[in-house]
Amino acid sequence: ARQHKGRAMNKIANHMPTAELQALDAAHHMHPFTDNSALAKKGARIMKSAKGVWLTDTEGHRIIDGMAGLWCVNIGYGRKELAAAAAAQMEELSYYNTFFQTSHIPAIALAAKIAEVAPGDLNHVFFAGSGSEANDTNIRMVRRYWDIKGQPEKRILIARTNGYHGSTMGGGSLGGMSGIHAHGGKIAGIVHIGEPNWWEQGGDMTPEDFGLLRARELETMILQLGVENVAAFIGEPVQGAGGVIIPPSTYWPEIQRIVDKYGILLIADEVITGFGRTGNWFGSETFGIKPHIMTIAKGLSSGYQPIGGSIVCDEVAEVMGSAGDFNHGYTYSGHPVAAAVALENIRILQEEHIVEHVRDVAHPYLWAKWQALTDHPLVGEAKLVGLMGSIALTPNKATRAKFASDTGTVGYRCRERCFANDLIMRHVGDRMIISPPLVITPDEIDILIARATKSLDECYAGLKADGMMKSA
């Protein structure tokens, strides 16, 4: 009877034992950004279900998700309304394309809703399946824009070292991450300037002076290349995958001044910062940026369906529409099911005042506790905007020194302690980062901070025991 009950429970749970799942995963599933041979030996942690800010794995551990999946589950997991929207749309119109002078109701309604919530004159949307695809769209769009205006030589896009704009050939080229460039190279016509990372690179300068210095690299690069050759500048309001690098207050106003002075297009990559993450609907509002094009994805559907897009200002859209076909698009541009889910997601964000919750409740509550982490012997800096934050790990707070070990060694150890303590935090080099679902409550923030502190304590004890609290 006990054996029968065990089999029945396993059937209800709807999965094989974890070890068997791990073996199947290792045999057939190639994971992104992963050493798959190392993972095969270790075995993946396998998630089974989720609700709100909580994940449950196949071993029954209840894990608080400090990263909202990959920065995307803004309204939290398990919202039945989004499942219902997907099911209803699948029954009514499961798929149709938006090529060949054809449209459908979900794409029309979503484009109009995005125009409603987007700032300024960002009133037009070109849909894609992801943020990476949307940034590939942006490369072609800005080059086509200048071509139509009779300046086809304006083809170069300027981006930033350690920026992230996806991992397609186009998006990966825009991003300034050497590890991505090493696997397949870059496409032509993209150059990079420095990032506004004061903690690691600011030396003895004030953050404000360093912000100006980094921003003015854009002007230097424009003049070096020739303004007649430069199409656009792209940047994330806050570098996400680069380590939640919140720029000094002087940085974005100076960038805006420079793009305005030289008349180049400004692309704000809001894949992470969009849809409430910074306490406003868009990070551009938080930092006073006025982009011509805005990249969106992730929080657009809270990750419930893959969808992205480029929100385009009136002037760029008018030019793009004045010269015949734009020979670009994707099978899943404006996919009706994804669009219906995104529309329902935005309804929930609006009607449940989730953006206001971030600004007025969650951020102020987390801010005080996040800053207090700088009292920990391992933490040199704690930064937070809205509900995305980072802490810098250092062996010497006074000098902001790096560890003698290879960059990322300490961060990885800390991340593993977080995982062991049922907290998902990510490490970027030796920075620990968070980006929890926007619906996180003060009580859940207390749990997140308690588990983060325990993990830092354990990491610090291990580093001391192994003689690793040494400066480079």
Residue locations for each model-derived region?
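Conserved N-terminal phosphate-binding loop of PLP-dependent enzymes in the Aspartate aminotransferase
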Residues: 10-472
